C-alpha cells in the first residue's frame, strides 16, 4: 500500500505581523497573523500536551507562545504587535516568551471585552 506523504507548504511572510493572545480561564491560544489577518502560525496549551487545569498556568502560556513564535520566526517574521484578550493567568509570561523567541514586540494592546453592565455574571463558587 502506498503511503501518503504530507507536504508542508513553505510560505515566505512579511517581516511584520500581529500576535493575538486569548487567555481564558481554561486555556490559552496564541495566533500569529500577517498584517492582512491571514494566519501564519498558531498554538494552544492543549496542542502542546497540557491537560485539565494545567492548561491555564504561566508555564503553559510560555511554552505555547514559544512554539507559535518559533514557527513564525522560521517563516520570516521579525516584528509584531501584540493584542491580548481575556482574564487568564500567564498573559505576561506569553509576552516574555515572544521576546525570548526572537520576535521584536513593538506594541502591546489589551483588547479584553468589558461589558457596560450587560449580562448577569455567574454565581460565586463555594468550595
From Swiss-Prot:
One Gene Ontology term from the biological process aspect of the record: translation
Lineage top rank: taxon: Bacteria
GO molecular function, one term: structural constituent of ribosome
Keywords: Ribonucleoprotein, Ribosomal protein, RNA-binding, rRNA-binding
Matches recorded under SUPFAM superfamilies: Translational machinery components
Gene3D superfamilies membership: Ribosomal protein S11
Matching Pfam families: Ribosomal_S11
GO cellular component term of the entry, any: ribonucleoprotein complex
Disulfide bond entries: none
Family: Belongs to the universal ribosomal protein uS11 family.
Function noted in UniProt: Located on the platform of the 30S subunit, it bridges several disparate RNA helices of the 16S rRNA. Forms part of the Shine-Dalgarno cleft in the 70S ribosome.
Subunit structure as annotated in this protein's UniProt entry: Part of the 30S ribosomal subunit. Interacts with proteins S7 and S18. Binds to IF-3.
PANTHER family noted in UniProt: 40S RIBOSOMAL PROTEIN S14/30S RIBOSOMAL PROTEIN S11
Name under which the protein is recorded: Small ribosomal subunit protein uS11
Organism of provenance: Pelodictyon phaeoclathratiforme (strain DSM 5477 / BU-1)
Amino acid at each position: 500500500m502506498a503511503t501518503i506523504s504530507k507536504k508542508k507548504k513553505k510560505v515566505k511572510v512579511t517581516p511584520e505581523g500581529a500576535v493575538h493572545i486569548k487567555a481564558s480561564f481554561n486555556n490559552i491560544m496564541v495566533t500569529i497573523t500577517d498584517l492582512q489577518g491571514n494566519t501564519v502560525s498558531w498554538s494552544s496549551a492543549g496542542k502542546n500536551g497540557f491537560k485539565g487545569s494545567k492548561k491555564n498556568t504561566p508555564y503553559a502560556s510560555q511554552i505555547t507562545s514559544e512554539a507559535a513564535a518559533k514557527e513564525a520566526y522560521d517563516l520570516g517574521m521579525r516584528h509584531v504587535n501584540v493584542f491580548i484578550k481575556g482574564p487568564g493567568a500567564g498573559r505576561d509570561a506569553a509576552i516574555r516568551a515572544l521576546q525570548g523567541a526572537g520576535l521584536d514586540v513593538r506594541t502591546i494592546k489589551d483588547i479584553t471585552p468589558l461589558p457596560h453592565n450587560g449580562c448577569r455574571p455567574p454565581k460565586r463558587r463555594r468550595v
